[in-house]
Each structure stands twice: as C-alpha cells, then as structure tokens.
C-alpha cells in the first residue's frame, strides 16, 4: 500500500479548472487552455506522499527550475509561458506557480546517469547492466560511469513505482525517431548541467526529465534539475564505495528507515509525521542546493 497519507483537497480558483493532484504539483487549466502548475511543499518518499510539508520547498523547486530553463534553452525549448499569478489565486501561490504550454507529453521518464547509485546500482549488482546497457566490472556505489547513459523509466501514478525500461522498449512505445530525440536531448541537457554544477562544487549524479511535443518541436517540461528530480552530491565529499552525502530528501529517507521513526517500510502502515528537526534539516538541504547552484541567497 502507498500513495497519499492525507490527500489534499484542491483549491477552487475562479477561472481555473483543477485537472490533477500529483505527488508534489497541482495542475489546473485556465480559460485560455494553458496549464497552471503549482508546486506545493509536499514531499514523497518510498512511494508515499508524507503527511508533513517542508516549508518553501515548492518555491525552491520552481525558482531553481526557472534558473536552469534559462541556461538550457538553446538545447531544448521549455514549456514556461509566464510566472504571473493567475487572477484570484491565493497569495501563497506566488513564486511556486508556472503558466505552461499544453503539450503532447511522452510517456517516458528520461533519466540520465553519470554515476552509479540507486536503482541503477541494484540492477548492476545483479546483471552488470543498467536498462540493458552493459557496464564494466568493478563499479561500486558512487562510481563515475565511463560516460553518461540514458536509462529511461515508465511514468508511475501516485503510490506506484517507476520501472526502468530498455531503450528498445521506449522505441517500441514512442517510435524510433522520437526515442532517438529523447535520448539525444536528455544526454545533451545532462552534460550541460553536469558541467555547470561541477564548476560550483556539485556532482550531478543523475537526473530525470520529462518531454512533450508542441507540434513537431520537442519541449522540456515539468521541473528540471531540482533536488526532487536529481541527485546532487558535494564534490569535496565524494567517495565511491558508500552512500554519498546529498542535497535532497535523502535525509528524510534515512530518518524513515531509522529506529527513531518506528516505521516498518515493508508494512502497509503509512509513514509517520516528520519531527521538526528533520523538517528543518531537509529545508536547509533544498535551500543550500539552490544557493550553491545559482550563487544567489534564498530569501
């Protein structure tokens, strides 16, 4: 069992139609037919949307995505039309709302990996492959790969888990030409972002993108290169062979699996609320990622 511990009720905003409540984002449509994407402070872990929110998280995700979009536009156009608050929207939406093009979304999570960890490490330890791609012997948790690889995954609903799939399966789903575009653009955007992050003392271990089509044009959508969609590691603490310190929700995962939480991940019971010290530390991680990447102070 998984999903929302406490599913939020969507806000009723004049002129907007609620379309979907996701793990983090609420999606609406305005009268012009554009999408209104609102990033909440919700946090998910182990396929559960937790009952405790992380203050400012949605704003950090939105502002960091906008910062990255500006630096990637020559590689991939993005879906953002405006950051103006829709008329009648609550003040709390300020800084966490994007007005976006409505796209024909591709049913694939486009994952790029430059380092081995997470589900990729699990598969590698069993088969010496990741998504069907053969990798050399001797790699450990945190190893840098010989080169970035494209390891797509299925898109899962709230409460379900993304599943890694082969490139060949993606080509069967979306067609060879589109699959090639997805792979090429994913790896190009990853390489650009990896180099930018590296200059700021951060390793971009892996990340996932979502794409859609606006006519014949492939467009980068959703969020990009945030602590929710990426693994960011401090470069000065990188040490292959162990779990790496990170600027993301790993702190929450660690607490949930610790004796302190009292939660059994294998049970069907929902996870407990987060204590204040975990909330504060997690918020600090998200803010630090924003500040180190952008060079700007969070306020």
From Swiss-Prot:
Pathway named in the protein's UniProt entry: Purine metabolism; IMP biosynthesis via de novo pathway; 5-amino-1-(5-phospho-D-ribosyl)imidazole-4-carboxamide from 5-amino-1-(5-phospho-D-ribosyl)imidazole-4-carboxylate: step 1/2
Record InterPro entries: SAICAR_synt/ADE2_N, SAICAR_synth, SAICAR_synthetase_CS
Family: Belongs to the SAICAR synthetase family.
Keywords on record: ATP-binding, Ligase, Nucleotide-binding, Purine biosynthesis
Pfam family membership, one: SAICAR_synt
Organism: Streptomyces avermitilis (strain ATCC 31267 / DSM 46492 / JCM 5070 / NBRC 14893 / NCIMB 12804 / NRRL 8165 / MA-4680)
The reaction(s) this protein catalyses: 5-amino-1-(5-phospho-D-ribosyl)imidazole-4-carboxylate + L-aspartate + ATP = (2S)-2-[5-amino-1-(5-phospho-beta-D-ribosyl)imidazole-4-carboxamido]succinate + ADP + phosphate + 2 H(+)
Transmembrane regions listed in the UniProt entry: none
SUPFAM superfamilies referenced in this protein's UniProt entry, alphabetically: SAICAR synthase-like
EC number: 6.3.2.6
Cleavable signal peptide: none
Name of the protein in its database record: Phosphoribosylaminoimidazole-succinocarboxamide synthase
Taxonomic classification: Bacteria, Bacillati, Actinomycetota, Actinomycetes, Kitasatosporales
Region described as Disordered: spans on this chain: 259-279
Enzyme class: ligase
The UniProt record lists the keyword Protein transport: no
PROSITE patterns, per database record: SAICAR_SYNTHETASE_2 (PS01058)
């Amino acid at each position: 069992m998984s999903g929302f511990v406490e599913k939020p009720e969507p806000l009723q905003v004049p002129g907007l139609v609620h379309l979907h409540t996701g793990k983090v984002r609420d999606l609406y449509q305005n009268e012009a037919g554009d999408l209104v994407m609102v990033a909440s402070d919700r946090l998910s872990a182990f396929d559960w949307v937790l009952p405790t929110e992380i203050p400012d998280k949605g704003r950090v995700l939105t502002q960091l995505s906008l910062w990255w979009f500006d630096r990637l536009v020559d590689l991939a156009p993005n879906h953002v039309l405006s950051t103006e608050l829709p008329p009648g929207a609550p003040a709390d939406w300020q800084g966490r709302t994007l007005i976006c093009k409505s796209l024909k979304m591709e049913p694939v999570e486009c994952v790029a990996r430059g380092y081995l960890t997470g589900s990729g490490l699990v598969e590698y330890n069993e088969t010496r492959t990741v998504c069907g791609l053969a990798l050399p012997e001797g790699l450990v948790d945190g190893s840098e790969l010989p080169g970035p690889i494209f390891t797509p995954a299925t898109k899962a609903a709230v409460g379900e888990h993304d599943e890694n799939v082969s490139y060949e399966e993606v080509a069967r789903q979306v067609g060879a030409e589109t699959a090639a575009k997805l792979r090429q653009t994913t790896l190009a955007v990853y390489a650009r972002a990896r180099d930018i992050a590296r200059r700021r003392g951060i390793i971009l271990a892996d990340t996932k993108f979502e794409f859609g089509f606006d006519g014949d044009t492939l467009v980068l959508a959703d969020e990009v290169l945030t602590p929710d969609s990426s693994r960011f590691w401090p470069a000065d603490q990188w040490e292959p062979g162990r779990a790496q310190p990170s600027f993301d929700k790993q702190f929450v995962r660690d607490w949930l699996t610790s004796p302190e939480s009292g939660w059994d991940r294998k049970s069907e019971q929902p996870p407990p609320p987060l204590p204040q010290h975990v909330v504060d530390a997690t918020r600090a991680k998200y803010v630090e990622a924003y500040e180190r990447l952008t060079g700007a102070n969070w306020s």
